[in-house]
């Protein structure tokens, strides 16, 4: 006779199942479990007196090649692909299968690629949330300590440019020239993070750009501080088309060499990733935001303006002065700074994210951005939008926020991967991809990851006093783990480069796997998962009011946010 468990008892023992609702952190966001791929009564669970023992849930007689290296049991997966419960099987650093694991000799429904055997390690996923590792695709490589901070927040991939705290790097995301590209690839080789570097694209001569692509740049960056003229834009995109790499752009705030229409004309329908498309981070004032409606533009935000709060405008003026080498004693510099900070467009940016018109969210690390807050600010924005706009139409039938949550998680996982030609190996919880995974307690979702895995190996974890008798006594905080040490970093992380540079970069002697980017020139806004809305956007040049398809959009700044002082003293 079957034994009947209450939903609460089942969730306490095996984690949530189909139809259950979970609150994310201290936000107002609720998700409902869409499906459960495990088998009731045959769940795998590790521990004394539990299922994963020899001859029970753990199978005997299988070769190592036929069983999993790592099994995450009964996990709630939150991904752009869905919000569902499953076991996750990992083999050779990649996601081998997602479904029901265990011992096929005695358990029904075991996936043939999810056999738990003698060589299988286990992470208990019951009561936990699993997401893909985050991708920050607007990195100023100013200091290596950024990577420790970002990794602890759940970011596992950096894409950007720089050479350290040089004046150019503090302002622009460029790693200029073959020498610097090689040195930066070598310098980051022992850090457990997937890495990619953008070469400098500001020139009207193709040869200087081609040299950087062949040296290992995964893409190119056009920045106004180096002169983002229509000629430079056209030339850079022409070279990118030849070598199948992405171009990122910070357009001309001062409109010296042209207006937003001039840059749009220079694009000539070719794909381009527009950084901080609202404009506070830089770009044609006051209407760079209109590019969110273009089919060839992949628009992203940086996190200082997300979400719009009562402090946003004041802190931006100070940030601008420092990051762009401006002088408060020069009136023109002050005017330059003030032209970029507009409450009206910042307010509209929140709503455009909620509509799916802005496709990605990144940091702008130490250059008007906080590298450890991409994930928490994404969920703060989602919370603020639910508070101000209510349930999305797509979510009303289930009375939960599944669609909104999938839309927002796509902004820092799959969409940056697609934009930069990396989605074949990272960016989502899908079979075949590198097992870059983040494990969260629901109470701490968006703020404090419990475990971070790179290539199926734990690289960071919440850990107590190393001298204690158990792992949990205070001080309890995020610490590097074995996967972040020695040669393990190379075995579990990727160095993203252009296809044209693969042979050259293999000669650099890197430990990380050299991985060419693919499909950068064919991607369009329509390919941005759950964030492909193409509105007709206009900005009033006098009032800065933003209209979408003829309707004025705005929202009030937040006075209080979740995932903030409840979780952080400082």
UniProtKB/Swiss-Prot annotation:
Residues 133-570 form the Urease domain. InterPro entries: Amidohydro-rel, Metal-dep_hydrolase_composite, Metal_Hydrolase, Urease_alpha_N_dom, Urease_alpha_subunit, Urease_AS, Urease_asu, Urease_asu_c. Its cofactor is Ni cation. Keywords: Cytoplasm, Hydrolase, Metal-binding, Nickel. It catalyses: urea + 2 H2O + H(+) = hydrogencarbonate + 2 NH4(+). The active site is at 324 (proton donor). Binds 2 nickel ions per subunit. Pathway: Nitrogen metabolism; urea degradation; CO(2) and NH(3) from urea (urease route): step 1/1. Pfam families: Amidohydro_1 (PF01979), Urease_alpha (PF00449). One of its GO terms (cellular component) is cytoplasm. PROSITE patterns: UREASE_1, UREASE_2, UREASE_3. Ni(2+) 1 binds at residues 138, 140, 221, 364. The modification N6-carboxylysine is found at residue 221. It is found in: Cytoplasm. It is an enzyme of class 3 (hydrolase). Gene3D superfamilies: Metal-dependent hydrolases, Urease, subunit C, domain 1. Carboxylation allows a single lysine to coordinate two nickel ions. Substrate binds at residue 223. Ni(2+) 2 binds at residues 221, 250, 276. Signal peptide: none annotated. Its main location: cytoplasm. Heterotrimer of UreA (gamma), UreB (beta) and UreC (alpha) subunits. Three heterotrimers associate to form the active enzyme. Belongs to the metallo-dependent hydrolases superfamily. Urease alpha subunit family. This is Urease subunit alpha. It comes from Cytophaga hutchinsonii (strain ATCC 33406 / DSM 1761 / CIP 103989 / NBRC 15051 / NCIMB 9469 / D465). The lineage of its organism: Bacteria, Pseudomonadati, Bacteroidota, Cytophagia, Cytophagales.
């Amino acid at each position: 006779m079957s034994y009947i468990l209450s939903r609460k008892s089942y969730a306490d023992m095996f984690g949530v199942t189909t139809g259950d609702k979970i609150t994310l952190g201290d936000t107002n966001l609720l998700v409902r479990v869409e499906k459960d791929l495990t088998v009731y009564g045959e769940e795998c669970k590790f521990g004394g007196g539990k299922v994963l023992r020899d001859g029970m849930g753990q199978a005997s007689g299988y070769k190592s090649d036929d069983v999993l290296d790592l099994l995450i049991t009964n996990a709630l997966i939150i991904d752009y692909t869905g919000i569902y419960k499953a076991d996750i099987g990992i083999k050779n650093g990649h996601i081998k299968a997602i479904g029901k694991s265990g011992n096929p000799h005695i358990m029904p429904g075991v996936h043939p690629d999810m056999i738990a055997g003698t060589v299988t390690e286990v992470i208990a996923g019951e009561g936990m949330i699993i997401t893909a590792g985050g991708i920050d695709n607007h990195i100023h490589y100013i200091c290596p300590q950024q990577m420790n901070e970002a990794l602890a927040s759940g970011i596992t991939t950096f894409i950007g440019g720089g050479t350290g705290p040089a004046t150019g790097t503090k302002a622009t995301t460029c790693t200029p020239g073959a020498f610097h590209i090689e040195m930066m690839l070598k310098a980051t080789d022992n850090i457990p993070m997937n890495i990619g570097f953008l070469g400098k694209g500001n020139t009207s001569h193709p040869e200087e750009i081609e040299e950087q692509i062949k040296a290992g740049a995964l893409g190119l960056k056009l920045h106004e501080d180096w002169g983002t003229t229509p000629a430079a834009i056209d030339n850079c995109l022409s070279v990118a088309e030849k070598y199948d790499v992405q171009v990122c752009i910070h357009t001309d705030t001062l409109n010296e060499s042209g207006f937003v229409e001039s840059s749009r004309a220079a694009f000539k329908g070719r794909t381009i990733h527009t950084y901080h498309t609202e404009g506070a981070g830089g770009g044609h004032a006051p209407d760079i935001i209109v590019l969110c409606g273009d089919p060839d533009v992949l628009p992203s935000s940086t996190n200082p303006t997300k979400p719009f709060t009562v402090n946003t405008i004041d802190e931006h003026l100070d940030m601008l002065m420092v990051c762009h080498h401006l002088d408060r004693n020069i009136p023109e510099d002050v005017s330059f700074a003030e032209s970029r900070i507009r409450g009206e467009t910042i307010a509209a940016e929140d709503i455009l994210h909620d509509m799916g018109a802005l496709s990605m969210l990144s940091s702008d690390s130490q250059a008007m951005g906080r590298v450890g807050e991409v994930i928490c600010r994404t969920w703060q924005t989602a919370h603020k939008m639910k508070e101000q706009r209510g349930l999305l139409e797509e979510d009303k039938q289930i009375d939960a926020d599944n669609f909104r949550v999938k839309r927002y998680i796509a902004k820092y996982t799959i969409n940056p991967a697609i934009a930069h030609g990396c989605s074949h190996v990272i960016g989502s919880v899908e079979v075949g991809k590198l097992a870059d995974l983040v494990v969260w307690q629901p109470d701490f979702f968006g703020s404090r990851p419990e475990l971070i895995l790179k290539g199926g190996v734990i690289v960071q974890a919440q850990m107590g006093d190393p001298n204690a008798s158990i792992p949990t006594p205070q001080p309890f905080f995020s610490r590097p783990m074995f996967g972040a040490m020695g040669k393990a970093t190379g075995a579990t992380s990727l160095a993203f480069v252009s296809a044209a540079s693969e042979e050259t970069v293999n000669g650099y002697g890197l430990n990380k796997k050299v991985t060419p980017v693919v499909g950068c020139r064919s991607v369009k806004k329509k390919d941005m998962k759950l964030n492909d809305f193409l509105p007709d956007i206009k900005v009033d040049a006098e009032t800065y009011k933003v209209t979408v398809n003829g309707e004025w959009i705005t929202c009030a700044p937040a006075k209080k946010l979740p995932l903030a002082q409840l979780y952080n003293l400082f």
